[in-house]
Amino acid sequence: MKIHKKYGVRVPATTANIGSGFDTLGMALGLYNEAYFTPVNELSLMKSHIDIQGEGAGKIKHGADNMVLQAMQAVAGKVGKEIPGGELKLINQIPLARGMGSSSAALVSGAYLANQLCGNVLNRHEILNIVTELEGHPDNVAPAIFGGFCFSIVKDKFVLTEQWKIPDTWKAVVAVPDFELRTEDARCALPDTYSREDLVQNIGAVSFLMAAVMMRRGELLKVGLADRIHVPYRLPLISGAEEAMKNADKKGCYGVTISGSGPTIIAFSSAEKAYEIGAAMVDGFKLHHVCLLYTSDAADD
């Protein structure tokens, strides 16, 4: 049996929507999944052996239902090449179904592994388009690929994205409750239509959110994170979230909102207040759920 060299990739967790930036804004966090692939010629891709360590061990699907393998197959199909199966090792730090981009991380991992196997024929923008097609929206995918704070839009079936560096003095404080909330279920909670007033308010809010990041003014985040499109409809699905958010606000965070579609809550703060804010968020959740806490810088690559 001929065994080839090992290929590898590391992909960050991401927080998407970021309050008023529904389906368009995302940011990479300093928490990572790693994926390693060793080709074995005698195996077909979907018959690859998968070893999973960390988050998702015992839960993540194998075979044709595995998202890493699906992305590998999609990239191979796009470039017109066939890649063999092999030994796939996943070392996961990103919690599943918590609003931290676990599915995007899996798809990006597979796309990058396949691109390496095919000779690195695709650039990052081409990978972004392929993975967005698989994921359905670019808000998590873009920061998983480019890092930093990304704003993205799909225009004529092509993803346009720009990246901005989050201020070094900001900390992301992430409270992760011990239950899952599937993106599909969170989307079902949203209304089919919105009032003009709500849409105008969100346009104004996202303008302040962009100003906060680009001008490095944390005090603008409270206005910038105020959302009327998804947050009010998803909060009732997350027991303890309102208490966690109120506690973070009382402790002086710049702003706080749902991470992705939830149930994770993310606050932004100065480094000096990060621990105190995180403890207050955990305290808000503790009447309902056990809660994990991460304090992170933005990941820039």
Model-derived segments and spans:
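ATP-binding N-lobe of GHMP and related small-molecule kinases
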Residues: 1-98, 120-122
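DPxDG-like acidic metal-binding loop motif
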Residues: 31, 100-123, 145-147, 155
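Short, well-ordered amphipathic alpha-helical segments that serve as non-catalytic structural scaffolds
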Residues: 67-76, 206, 244, 281
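Alpha/beta catalytic cores of group-transfer enzymes, especially the acyltransferase/condensing modules
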Residues: 122-168, 236, 256-258, 266
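Conserved, helical-rich catalytic subdomain that frames metal- and/or nucleotide-binding sites
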Residues: 175-176, 187-251
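Helix N-cap motif at beta-to-alpha junctions
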Residues: 270-274
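Short amphipathic alpha-helices in soluble, non-transmembrane regions
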Residues: 277-285
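Conserved small/polar residues in nucleotide/adenosyl-binding loops
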Residues: 294-299
